[in-house]
Curated annotation (Swiss-Prot):
One of its GO terms (biological process) is phospholipid biosynthetic process. Pfam families: NAD_Gly3P_dh_C, NAD_Gly3P_dh_N. Keywords: Cytoplasm, Lipid biosynthesis, Lipid metabolism, NAD, NADP, Nucleotide-binding, Oxidoreductase, Phospholipid biosynthesis, Phospholipid metabolism. Pathway: Membrane lipid metabolism; glycerophospholipid metabolism. It comes from Nitrobacter winogradskyi (strain ATCC 25391 / DSM 10237 / CIP 104748 / NCIMB 11846 / Nb-255). GO terms for cellular component: cytosol. This is Glycerol-3-phosphate dehydrogenase [NAD(P)+]. The active site is at residue 190. Belongs to the NAD-dependent glycerol-3-phosphate dehydrogenase family.
Amino acid sequence: MKPLNRICVIGAGAWGTALAGVAARAGREVTLYARDAAAAAQISATRDNPRLPGIPLDRGIVVTHDIAAAGSSDIVIIAAPAQHSRTAITTLAPHLSPGTPVIASAKGIEHGTRRFMTEVIEEAAPHAVPAILSGPSFADDVARGLPTAVTLAAKDEALAIALVHALGSAAFRPYHTTDVRGVEIGGAAKNVLAIAAGIVVGKQLGASALAALTTRGFSELVRLGCACGGRGETLAGLSGLGDLILTCSSPQSRNFSLGIALGRGDPAPRDKLSEGAHTAPALLELAAARDVEMPVAQAVAAILAGRLTIDGAIDNLLTRPFRGEG
C-alpha cells in the first residue's frame, strides 16, 4: 500500500478544522478545503476559524478554496454534515484519483434515500474507497488536542489499519474495524436518542429517568444495528455505546441541547445543526423495513414532526405493556 501522507479535509467548519488539526498532529501534510472563498482566505490569513474561537490553526495546514487540491491527496476526509455530504462528494469526485480512501465523518442517514455515508460515497464517487470515522468526540476537545478515542472502519482491514496509523497520535486514538455498518448505525442512532435524553433533562424528569431512557435507547440501537448486519462488539464500543453516553450527557451535544430546549418548551436553537432531527425519519424507515421496534426513536420523530406532544410521547412510553428486558 502506498504511503498515506497527504490528507485533505473537505469542510472548514468546526469538525473539519478539528480533524485537520488531528492530521497535522499526526505529522501529515494537510489541506483544509472551505467552500466559501472569503472564509478560506480569512482562515488562511488569521489562522483562526470563528467556528473554533481561541484555537489557532496549525501553521502547516494549507487552507484553500480549490477543490482540485484534493486530487493530489492520499486520503480525503469528508467533514460536511450528513445531509450535505453527497453534494460535497459529487463536487470532489472528478478530482479524485482511483482508489483514494474517502473517510466519511458525519453521523447520520441521508434523508429520502436512507443511505449511510459510505453508501453515499460509493454512489457519488464509485472510484473511491469509502471508510467511516465515528465515536465520542466533540470538535472543541479534538481541536485542543485533548485525549479522544474513536473507531475507524473500512471493509478492507489492511486499509483500516493504515488509516488508523495515518491519523493516530497520543491524543487521538482510533481503533480499527471492518464493521462499517455497525459504526454507521451507532453514529446515526445515538443522535436521535440524544434528543430524547435532552427532553428528559429539559422536563426535569430526574437522573433515574435519564439512565432508563439512555439504556432503553441503547437497546434500540443494538436491535437495529444487529438487524442491519452490525456486530455486537462494535455497537457496545466507542462508536455505539461510547458515543451515546457522551451525546446523552453533555450540553456540547447539539442533539442533546435541542432536546433540552424542547423539554423546557423553549424555541429550538436555530444556529446549531442537529443531525438527529434530520436522521430521525430515515432511521425509522430503516427500522420498519427490518421489522425493528424503536419506541424511543419513534417518539422523537413524532415530536419533531408535530404529530405528538412531549407529554403525549412520555405517556405513550410509560404505559407500554410490561415485558422482559432485552
